[in-house]
Amino acid sequence: MRMMMALIVLMTVAPALIAAPAKAQQPLSHIVEPGDTWSALSMRFGVEESHLKVLNPHFNASRQPVIGTTISLPGEASERSGRLIRDGNPGIIAVALENNVPLWSLARDNGLESPYRPTFFRPLIVPAEGTIRDLPPGITTLEVSSSPALPGIALGIRGASQAKVPDISGHLDGLPLAFATENNRFVGVVGTGAFFAGGEPELVIKSGDAPAWVQPWQFAEREWIYQELTLTGEAAQIDQEARDEERARLRELWSQITPEPLWQDQFITPVATYLEVSAGYGARRSYNGGPYLTYHEGVDYSAYGGTPVTAPAAGQVILAEPLYVRGGTVIIDHGLGIFTGYYHLSAIHAIAGQTVQPGDVLGEVGTTGLSTGNHLHWDLLINGIWVDAAVWQEQQMDCWILEGLGRPCGTETPPG
């Protein structure tokens, strides 16, 4: 009887003693930043590259993770800190000596059986505080201004190097970046234009004599509006040839890049009082029933004729005269390949060669040139490419650039 009771108790308890099958851990998500290559992510989270690529399939297996996208990590991934070094010629022994790390400890932490075998350019992790990232040689930090990016806006990269910034250059899908450096800091800026295809173009950075560093950058889609404009009178007589001739002359001015930023404050809107924003940047335009072959290159502020137009930031006036298409025109060079233009003015008060400060009067609102009514057309260019001036202000790109160089950025609006 006792044996029977024991069996019953055992049968009752036994199921509770059997461990339930472990639930699979849910994948983690990670937003890709510059330097998050497959090898860097593998070392940072302790996951094989092959496993990461299985979790994040792409038709091009050799393509690095795209900046601004979200990728999956195994649920058991555990992050560690350190600094990634591309081994190259010195070898692991030289890396250990340079970083004051025990040789065998460095080999063990990098999964090497022996420190005396060649590493064949394999990246190494040395103990350090900070995030493990695979950056251009000599560069210790790198960030982008927008992630994901948008076509038609100002884009930038900024970072720092171990010592003085090496000779640095770069491009985004063939569009060159304009760089400024200060001590161990650097900033690069580029514009894409409203017709930029977007997708996942490659950001390429060249640091010194080292091979180019490449990582794709995600662009989100942007919605544009379509406008049909009817031109009459003198404005209707302005043909495409006249536009091209005027633009060719201005491109010569826009190509002369001042290497340093000339501004110290946030850009202010160049008209203190206006009726409305009558046209935004990027709007696709048809003139007198023609095809939509162009886009609006600036921001239009509808205002009463004679309203003062002022400088948004410090810079040098490089043109101040009436033009055939743009009418009364003032163009300012703000440095670092950044220019602003003020068109259709009824009166011009600035002089070419003049240095201006925020709030200085440039001219007055009018309707000269290719215009359908009193308004100010304000545009902003980077390396000769038009970008959205309104988004520049929203992003506070002016301060983002200055802060990247370690400079202060004022935010006070000058008195009117």
What are the roles of these predicted feature ranges?
Residues 23-31, 47-85, 102-140, 181-186, ...:
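Extracellular LysM carbohydrate-binding repeats and other cell-envelope/extracellular binding modules
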Residues 24, 127-216, 221:
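Cationic-aromatic interfacial patches
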Residues 35, 68, 89, 120-124, ...:
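Loop/turn positions that initiate beta-strands
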Residues 101, 112, 118-121, 277, ...:
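Conserved, short, structured surface segments that act as functional micro-motifs
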Residues 138, 221-255, 262-264, 302, ...:
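Acidic, glycine-rich catalytic/binding loops that coordinate metals and/or anionic ligands
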Residues 216-326:
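Surface-exposed, glycine-biased beta-strand/turn segments
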Residues 296-297, 311-349, 374-379:
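Zn2+-dependent peptidoglycan hydrolase active-site motif and core
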Residues 308-318, 350-365:
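Short, well-structured beta-strand-loop connectors
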